[in-house]
């Protein structure tokens, strides 16, 4: 239960588990695109995972993953796999780092809700070191401070190791719902679907920025 929200597995964690199953079943090791549908609640007990290969070519393969519990389909994923070790061509990912990299780290605060209510921080957050911008820390605000943009940005890591593709998938559903920075606590906001696109594996500290239009 280290990767749970209460008694429910975290959405990014489930995506990472399904991606792992897909990558082990396909001829290409890296899941460069995945689309996950969370169809029903997954309980904290045994599951089964079934993988179907839909298409295979020299440079990519496509598969479908079904997560089943109590003979009921709980989550479904389609994914495209390739191999970063053989992907060549134009690279447009070299962009200037955002201004936030130049800000002092004391302008960030640990992602921890326990000062609002003891035990309020989900267990999956405690597996990481995450510091977010203070202006996005909705749990420290009062009603007069609300109304900011629906956004959350910060730095995140799990130990000293560089995250692999599965950790990236876990991170993709990591931050609290950004609408809370605008409207305050809204209770449980479930993830109904999650799309990840991984273009290359990271080589350094990760900065993450989530926003809602």
Predicted regions and their residues:
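Segments adjacent to and within acyl-thioester-processing domains across lipid
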Residues: 74-176
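Hydrophobic, proline/glycine-rich low-complexity stretches
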Residues: 1-46, 54-58, 63, 172-205
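Short amphipathic alpha-helical surface micro-motifs
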Residues: 14-20, 44-48, 70, 110-114, ...
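Preference for bulky hydrophobic residues occupying beta-strand positions
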Residues: 36, 65, 79, 154-156, ...
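Conserved small/polar residues in nucleotide/adenosyl-binding loops
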Residues: 207-213
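HotDog/MaoC-like acyl-thioester-processing domains
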Residues: 8-9, 17, 33, 42-113, ...
């Amino acid at each position: 239960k280290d990767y749970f929200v209460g008694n429910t597995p975290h959405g990014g964690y489930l995506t990472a588990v399904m991606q792992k199953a897909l990558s082990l079943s396909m001829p290409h090791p890296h899941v460069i695109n995945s689309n996950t549908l969370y169809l029903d609640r997954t309980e904290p007990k045994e599951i089964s995972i079934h993988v179907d290969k839909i298409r295979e070519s020299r440079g990519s393969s496509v598969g479908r993953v079904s997560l089943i519990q109590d003979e009921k389909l709980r989550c479904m994923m389609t994914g495209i796999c390739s191999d970063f070790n053989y992907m060549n061509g134009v690279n447009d990912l070299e962009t200037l780092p955002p201004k936030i990299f130049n800000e002092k780290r004391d302008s960030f605060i640990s992602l921890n809700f326990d000062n609002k209510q003891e035990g309020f921080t989900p267990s999956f957050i405690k597996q990481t070191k995450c510091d977010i911008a203070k202006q996005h820390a909705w749990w420290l605000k009062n009603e007069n401070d609300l109304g900011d943009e629906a956004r959350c940005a910060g730095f995140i890591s799990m130990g000293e190791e560089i995250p692999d593709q599965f950790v990236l998938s876990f991170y993709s559903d990591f931050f609290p719902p950004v609408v809370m920075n605008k409207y305050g606590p809204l209770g449980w906001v479930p993830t109904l679907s999650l799309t990840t696109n991984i273009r290359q594996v990271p080589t350094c500290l990760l900065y993450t920025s989530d926003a809602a239009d």
